[in-house]
Amino acid sequence: MCGIVGIVGHKPVSERLIEALGRLEYRGYDSSGVATIFEGELHRRRAEGKLGNLKTRLKEAPLSGTVGIAHTRWATHGAPTECNAHPHFTDGVAVVHNGIIENFSKLKDALAEVGTKFQTDTDTEVIAHLLTKFRRDGMGCLEAMHAMLKCVEGAFALAILFEDDPATIMVARNGPPLVIGHGDGEMFLGSDAIALAPFTNDITYLNDGDWAVVGKTSVQVFDIEGNVVTRPRHISLATADLVGKGNHPHFMEKEIYEQPEVIARALGHYINVNDSHVTTTSTDIDFAGVESLAISACGTAYLAGLIGKYWFERYARLIVEIDVASEFRYREIPLSPRSAALFISQSGETADTLASLRYCKAHGLRIGAVVNTRESTMAREADAIFPILAGPEIGVASTKAFTCQLAVLAALRIGAGKARGTITDDEEQVLVQSLATLPGVMRQVLNDITPEIELLSRELSHYRDVLYLGRGTSFPLAMEGALKLKEVSYIHAEGYAAGELKHGPIALIDENMPVIVIAPHDRFFDKTVSNMQEVAARGGRIILITDETGASMSKLPTMHTIVLPDVAEIIAPMIFSLPLQLLAYHTAVVMGADVDQPRNLAKSVTVE
């Protein structure tokens, strides 16, 4: 959500700031802006809509200056208008902000009482006015910054310019991530390392509560009490070439087709094909001594965790508690120190998931983080890190991160079963060999089913409501398929457990309701066929996704049947996710939707 970049340099920065913002577009936004200091004065350009609109403004009215900040805004307080776009200016101060100031109404009222006039509907403007007030009260820039931070409550990442201090940018972090990049005679800042990849890979990650003064050749970091602190520098693995589309029209399509490659890389970290065993690392959780397991995540990551719940319960005989992170942390769950917790997040910065992680850590649980970004806050705060190694995922709708999360959870399920004595050596070998076939089968399926999915998507695009059904691990897949379709095509879709059909959804079924049934030939197949018969009896349009054995056994007429190869149970969820992803993608393309940046959505939700 939102993106922040800044440069303290020795040459003009406006074009480089816009270039860096382009690498943050995946985070979601609805307006953008840039500000620089030139000849002792602040200057800015802002625009509603896509970044191209801001580029046009800059062509019409270029900005000079070697120090500047820029921002992509995802509206939380105030409509997505140019007036509400960042940076916000008050006398001698420019502010960009990612997050939510929870006490802004109280602060706004207090400022209004002393004559402050507000120009926007945003919470961010409060920050600028506080800084201006403290400066007028006689405080220096550093003192005013510290005083402001003691006033505001909520989640925020900030970058601030002062006209009186034209050679620095002041920054702060409390929740949303903020990184500092060390260059050659210049310094950079951004919401993540990807934004800075063409400029530097020498990165300092700020901790929650940190604030800093960034100069041309150095950064001084303070904690919330104003004490100088030292934060380590890291070499980031993010590179600029990882965020291109290649030969694909959209990032989402590129990332769908990258899955065989990234799955192979992920599995290589967790299984040893030569001796058919899962690998152990120094960060493994000791599942043998764990009484129960808690899993928490948001969105697609939660659905990966739900599949993980089925696996850990059935094959490791673990009691598993799972909930969406926004609910998990408020339920006051009885937690035992002999329990462990897994938190799943592509970015490793998801606000609700991070809050749930901290809740469990405070209760003494051992924490595992299944993340795509090893330098993320969740990874740094966890006891055990389980990287999914998917590489940067730019499309807002998660595809390759989802299947990599499943691959990692599948390997962990084997390791947990071995540790707890519920999986034998022979069973481990069979499971590992099955996992090893996954990249090749994925590649085959993507090649085989794409043409028929393209045709089916044209028909599906004419409907406004779609129901997805599944049993067992296919139930979370049904919810994931529905989520993908609604995210990128804006078609209303819901995923249900097939056994719940008679408890409500069946009332909606008629000839205008496509019903996508996910039915591998497993122990649930016959019951799922019974549900399909109920749909057919009411005129529902069945789209069946099954395997070769299932297709040979189902005699019901369908609108379309997608036939996948027979595969081992452990890799079936990853294989069956592919037609769901492709169907959502191609339907959205047919409908002319913005596939990579769906309306109102953000890739990384860093506020609650």
Curated annotation (Swiss-Prot):
GO molecular function: carbohydrate derivative binding; glutamine-fructose-6-phosphate transaminase (isomerizing) activity
Keyword terms: Aminotransferase, Cytoplasm, Glutamine amidotransferase, Nodulation, Plasmid, Repeat, Transferase
EC number(s) given by UniProt: 2.6.1.16
Annotated catalysed reactions: D-fructose 6-phosphate + L-glutamine = D-glucosamine 6-phosphate + L-glutamate
Subcellular location field: Cytoplasm
Organism: Rhizobium leguminosarum bv. viciae
Role noted for this protein: Involved in the production of the root hair deformation (HAD) factor specifically on medicago.
Cellular component GO terms held in the UniProt record: cytosol
Presence of the UniProt keyword Cytoplasm in the record: yes
Main subcellular location: cytoplasm
Domain (Glutamine amidotransferase type-2): residue spans on this chain: 2-217
Classification via InterPro entries: GATase_2_dom, GFAT, GFAT_N, GlmS/AgaS_SIS, GlmS/FrlB_SIS, Ntn_hydrolases_N, SIS_dom, SIS_dom_sf
The protein's enzyme class: transferase
SIS domain span: 283-422, 456-598
Gene: nodM
Record-level GO BP terms: carbohydrate metabolic process; fructose 6-phosphate metabolic process; protein N-linked glycosylation; UDP-N-acetylglucosamine metabolic process
NCBIfam families linked: glmS (TIGR01135), PRK00331.1 (NF001484)
Active site: C2, K603
The name this protein goes by in its record: Glutamine--fructose-6-phosphate aminotransferase [isomerizing]
